[in-house]
Amino acid sequence: MKVGVLALQGAVAEHIRLIEAVGGEGVVVKRAEQLAELDGLIIPGGESTTIGKLMRRYGFIEAIRDFSNQGKAVFGTCAGLIVIADKIAGQEEAHLGLMDMTVQRNAFGRQRESFETDLPVKGIDRPVRAVFIRAPLIDQVGNGVDVLSEYNGQIVAARQGHLLAASFHPELTDDSSMHAYFLDMIREAR
């Protein structure tokens, strides 16, 4: 099973390491044409506005929309969550607009307010280690979106069919459970 990690920004190598730890084949994605060979795609963190601009410049917007429209699994972490959302609070235009949710950028504060915690995640039998760095949150979800995890009453992980979103960075820990969950989603989508 080939899982790509969009290599425009973010902890690409760390995602690849965890994909491979749970039995997937990790692929560094630098060109839109590479999507054709993939079973799933991770859009990692970074800065969502910059990621959006780079996606437009390098032809990823329509390519990723087409990939998702084929029913292939997409996982957005931190800024990647913002990129796949269909609404961003305080912003007129979404980037990919794939997942029926409204998100708020930098909801957990600045860099110095970053933290780690263990979260219960629906569908995973033990708490998941989560790193929050200038993390967004999910303000609202539409019908058909399943809330997977909350932190202090705020939504931090959700799923809509073949789409998965997490406010946190699962790749910055040694906990591979979110990546295992994503690989299970890819198997379901086949």
From Swiss-Prot:
Residues that bind L-glutamine: G46, E47, S48, R105, I133, R134
Keywords: Glutamine amidotransferase, Hydrolase, Lyase, Pyridoxal phosphate
Record-linked InterPro entries: Class_I_gatase-like, PdxT/SNO, PdxT/SNO_CS
Transmembrane portions of the chain: none
Pfam families recorded: SNO (PF01174)
Pathway(s) where this gene product acts: Cofactor biosynthesis; pyridoxal 5'-phosphate biosynthesis
KW Hydrolase (keyword) present: yes
Entry EC number(s): 4.3.3.6, 3.5.1.2
GO molecular function, one term: pyridoxal 5'-phosphate synthase (glutamine hydrolysing) activity
GO CC terms, sorted: cytosol; glutaminase complex
GO biological process: glutamine catabolic process; pyridoxal phosphate biosynthetic process; pyridoxine metabolic process
Residues of the active site: C78, H169, E171
Catalytic activity: aldehydo-D-ribose 5-phosphate + D-glyceraldehyde 3-phosphate + L-glutamine = pyridoxal 5'-phosphate + L-glutamate + phosphate + 3 H2O + H(+); L-glutamine + H2O = L-glutamate + NH4(+)
Function according to Swiss-Prot or TrEMBL: Catalyzes the hydrolysis of glutamine to glutamate and ammonia as part of the biosynthesis of pyridoxal 5'-phosphate. The resulting ammonia molecule is channeled to the active site of PdxS.
Family the entry assigns: Belongs to the glutaminase PdxT/SNO family.
HAMAP family: PdxT (MF_01615)
Complexes and interactors: In the presence of PdxS, forms a dodecamer of heterodimers. Only shows activity in the heterodimer.
Name this protein carries in UniProt: Pyridoxal 5'-phosphate synthase subunit PdxT
Organism of this sequence: Niallia circulans (Bacillus circulans)
